[in-house]
From Swiss-Prot:
Protein name stated in the entry: Large ribosomal subunit protein uL11
A GO CC annotation given for this chain: cytosolic large ribosomal subunit
Cross-referenced Pfam families: Ribosomal_L11, Ribosomal_L11_N
Assembly, per entry: Part of the ribosomal stalk of the 50S ribosomal subunit. Interacts with L10 and the large rRNA to form the base of the stalk. L10 forms an elongated spine to which L12 dimers bind in a sequential fashion forming a multimeric L10(L12)X complex.
PROSITE patterns on file: RIBOSOMAL_L11
Function noted in UniProt: Forms part of the ribosomal stalk which helps the ribosome interact with GTP-bound translation factors.
GO molecular function: large ribosomal subunit rRNA binding; structural constituent of ribosome
GO BP annotations, alphabetical order: translation
Keywords attached to this entry: Methylation, Ribonucleoprotein, Ribosomal protein, RNA-binding, rRNA-binding
Naturally occurring in which organism (per UniProt): Geobacillus sp. (strain WCH70)
Length: 141
């Protein structure tokens, strides 16, 4: 028989840097999960993606065991890395902070494809372009 799920915890943690301090500790402590076991496993699984923020969905079962799924980094994080900027524009409609090429947008869309509910790569590109526009990043061909 399948184990009964008691909680699903969603977090965004820097790759390879999970530790028992907030926000990880309190979120998992409430669910009764072995925090160190999660941190070690997460850090091992994301060591190759250093510098990126990784969304993770932790499923906690009745016997306090857990499984987790890592997702692709948020589009905004990937766009900031591609444009080489620290943060997006405070007023994206007035001042633009960076410019990136359309092929870079395609690359990000291809990376995000498993987590997006887009039918085609073009639809995924439009989603990423929308995120870029809202951050004050200009896309050029």
């Amino acid at each position: 028989m399948a184990k009964k799920v008691i909680k699903v915890v969603k977090l965004q943690i820097p790759a390879g840097k999970a530790n028992p301090a907030p926000p990880v500790g309190p979120a998992l402590g409430q669910a009764g999960v072995n925090i160190m076991a999660f941190c070690k496993e997460f850090n091992a699984r994301t060591a190759d993606q250093a510098g990126l923020i990784i969304p993770v969905e932790i499923t906690v079962f009745e016997d306090r065991s857990f499984t987790f799924i890592t997702k692709t980094p948020p589009a905004a994080v990937l766009l900031k890395k591609a444009a080489g900027i620290e943060s997006g524009s405070g007023e994206p409609n007035r001042n633009k902070v960076a410019t990136i090429k359309r092929d870079k947008v395609r690359e990000i869309a291809e990376m995000k494809m498993p987590d997006l509910n887009a039918a085609s790569i073009e639809a995924a590109m439009r989603m990423v372009e929308g995120t870029a526009r809202s951050m004050g990043i200009v896309i050029e061909d």
